[in-house]
């Protein structure tokens, strides 16, 4: 018999095989004809009529019609994180990453470039030396050596691995972004993908729900359809977040790259936990999660921004995509008690710059913008886009009006 196979990237090919052969034999034929790198047997999943084909079952048992096709989904093996040992010569380029971070951590990372190696050369004083290590670079940190030193005392040692991954240059950065976003679909490709997955035997509502839960990753959407969309199990783990992640009470604009840059150092020192767990305690990540849940199509732009500002974090995300998506799917926490207080203070002193309310779940976050930024947002709104979407796109594109306009025009605004 001749089996027609189709990938989620619309590649179609045919394999001749005896119906008495098993599914595993078909996988081995696919690997031999298409290459071990692209179609490894261990990573293949064959799907027909909404069911995963079992390796030990004969092909004739599934009654595969030669006029129909079998979907081939290849899952990449989970990469092993090796970013921790790369801690040699950190003083080359840590300052650019530290400068791009938010003011709360910029003051903490400012002393990191010069004493990055001296604290590691004197490990005799571990816990007590945290204050002395932060008091030595007092000229770089200027004032406030006491209170900031209590929270970011870890950062001088933590920033060392960051430049190790950023040294290869822009090519590696773009490769990371392509790897993280290659499987995401938007615009017309989204509709094509919905139709394609529906041809496997699923209802449109199921397909759209799975794509939304996977943030338009078709491979993972098919997994969710087959295995079930994950619930809110991981949200129970966020019961008592550590208090050290409280930056400043003032609301910050949702520039996700800055949020990512502030947390670069923490990625390599989450002892015993998942490399991405530290994001849960970052107010910027909670803001990012809220934005993405409202509009999943913004995810590629946000990943691109993270790749520019923080390639190490993007690498961690690409290596743990499933965990990252589960974290994004968690319900947004009502953190309005602390952030709301800071926002109220900013609103009370209004009259200088403009204030724009960002849509939230149950509360409003006010973002302070300059008159020029407000004019740019009004111009984007004049194109016919809703204000909430315009604000998200404008800040996601680093306040680049032209880029935000192009991004908005490329999106599909059909209500699910």
Swiss-Prot record:
Keywords: Cytoplasm, DNA damage, DNA repair, Nucleus, Phosphoprotein, Proteasome, Repeat, Ubl conjugation pathway
Cell compartments where the protein resides: Nucleus; Cytoplasm
Function: Multiubiquitin chain receptor involved in modulation of proteasomal degradation. Binds to polyubiquitin chains. Proposed to be capable to bind simultaneously to the 26S proteasome and to polyubiquitinated substrates and to deliver ubiquitinated proteins to the proteasome. May play a role in endoplasmic reticulum-associated degradation (ERAD) of misfolded glycoproteins by association with PNGase and delivering deglycosylated proteins to the proteasome.
UniProt lineage: Eukaryota, Metazoa, Chordata, Craniata, Vertebrata
Homology family: Belongs to the RAD23 family.
Gene (UniProt): Rad23b
GO terms, molecular function: damaged DNA binding; DNA damage sensor activity; polyubiquitin modification-dependent protein binding; RNA polymerase II cis-regulatory region sequence-specific DNA binding; RNA polymerase II-specific DNA-binding transcription factor binding; transcription cis-regulatory region binding
Record-linked CDD domains: UBA1_Rad23, UBA2_HR23B, Ubl_HR23B
Region (Disordered): 83-175, 333-356
Changes seen on gene knockout: Impaired embryonic development with a 90 % rate of intrauterine or neonatal death. Surviving animals display a variety of abnormalities, including retarded growth, facial dysmorphology and male sterility. The effect on NER competence is reported conflictingly: According PubMed:11809813 no change in NER activity is found and according PubMed:15336624 a reduced NER activity is seen. Embryonic lethal with Rad23a and Rad23b double deficiency. Double deficient cells show reduced cell survival upopn UV radiation and reduced steady-state level of Xpc indicating a reduced NER capacity.
Entry superkingdom: Eukaryota
PTM-bearing positions, type Phosphothreonine: 155, 186
Subunit record text: Component of the XPC complex composed of XPC, RAD23B and CETN2. Interacts with NGLY1 and PSMC1. Interacts with ATXN3. Interacts with AMFR. Interacts with VCP; the interaction is indirect and mediated by NGLY1.
Alphabetical GO biological process terms: cellular response to interleukin-7; DNA damage response; embryonic organ development; nucleotide-excision repair; proteasome-mediated ubiquitin-dependent protein catabolic process; regulation of proteasomal ubiquitin-dependent protein catabolic process; spermatogenesis
Biased composition (Pro residues): 112-121
Gly residues bias: start-end ranges: 337-356
Protein name from the UniProt record: UV excision repair protein RAD23 homolog B
Biased composition (Low complexity): 83-111, 122-143
Pfam families recorded: UBA, ubiquitin, XPC-binding
Location of the Ubiquitin-like domain: 1-79
SUPFAM superfamilies associated with the record: UBA-like, Ubiquitin-like, XPC-binding domain
Domain STI1: 274-317
Entry annotated with the keyword Transferase: no
GO cellular component: cytoplasm; cytosol; nucleoplasm; nucleus; proteasome complex; XPC complex
Residue ranges constituting the UBA domain according to the UniProt record: 188-228, 371-411
Chief location category: nucleus
Signal sequence extent: none
Phosphotyrosine modifications at: 202
């Amino acid at each position: 018999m001749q089996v027609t196979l189709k990938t989620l990237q619309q590649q179609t090919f045919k394999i001749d095989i005896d119906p008495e052969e098993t599914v595993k034999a078909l996988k081995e034929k696919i690997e031999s004809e298409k290459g071990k790198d692209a179609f490894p047997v261990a990573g293949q999943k064959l799907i027909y009529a909404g069911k995963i084909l079992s390796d030990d079952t004969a092909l004739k048992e599934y009654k595969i019609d030669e006029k129909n096709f079998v979907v081939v989904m290849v899952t990449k093996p989970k990469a092993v994180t090796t970013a921790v040992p790369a801690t040699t010569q950190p003083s080359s380029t840590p300052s650019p990453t530290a400068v791009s971070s938010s003011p709360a951590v910029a003051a903490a990372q400012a002393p990191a470039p010069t004493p990055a190696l001296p604290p590691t050369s004197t490990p005799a004083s571990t816990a007590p030396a945290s204050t002395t290590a932060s008091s030595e670079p007092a000229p770089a940190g200027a004032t406030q050596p006491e209170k900031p030193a209590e929270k970011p005392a870890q950062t001088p040692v933590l920033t060392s691995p960051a430049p190790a991954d950023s040294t290869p240059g822009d090519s590696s950065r773009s490769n990371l972004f392509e790897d993280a976003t290659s499987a995401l679909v938007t615009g017309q490709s989204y509709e094509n993908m919905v139709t394609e997955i529906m041809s496997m035997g699923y209802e449109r509502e199921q397909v759209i729900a799975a794509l939304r839960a996977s943030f338009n990753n078709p491979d993972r959407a098919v997994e969710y359809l087959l295995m079930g969309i994950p619930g809110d199990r991981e949200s129970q783990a966020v019961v008592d977040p550590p208090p050290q992640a409280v930056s400043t009470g003032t609301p910050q604009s949702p520039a996700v790259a800055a949020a990512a840059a502030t947390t670069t150092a923490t990625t390599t020192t989450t002892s015993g936990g998942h490399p991405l767990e530290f994001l849960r305690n970052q107010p910027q990540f909670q803001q990012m999660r809220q934005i993405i849940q409202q509009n999943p199509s913004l995810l590629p732009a946000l990943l691109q921004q993270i790749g520019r500002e923080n390639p190490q974090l993007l690498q961690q995300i690409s290596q743990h995509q499933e965990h990252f998506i589960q974290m994004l799917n968690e319900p947004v926490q009502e953190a309005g008690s602390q952030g709301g207080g800071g926002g109220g203070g900013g609103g009370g002193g209004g009259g200088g710059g403009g204030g724009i309310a960002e849509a939230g779940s149950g509360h409003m976050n006010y973002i302070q913008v300059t008159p020029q930024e407000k004019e740019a947002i009004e111009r984007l709104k004049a194109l016919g886009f809703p204000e909430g979407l315009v604000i998200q796109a404008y800040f996601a594109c680093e306040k680049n009006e032209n880029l935000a306009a192009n991004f908005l025009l490329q999106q599909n605004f059909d209500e699910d």
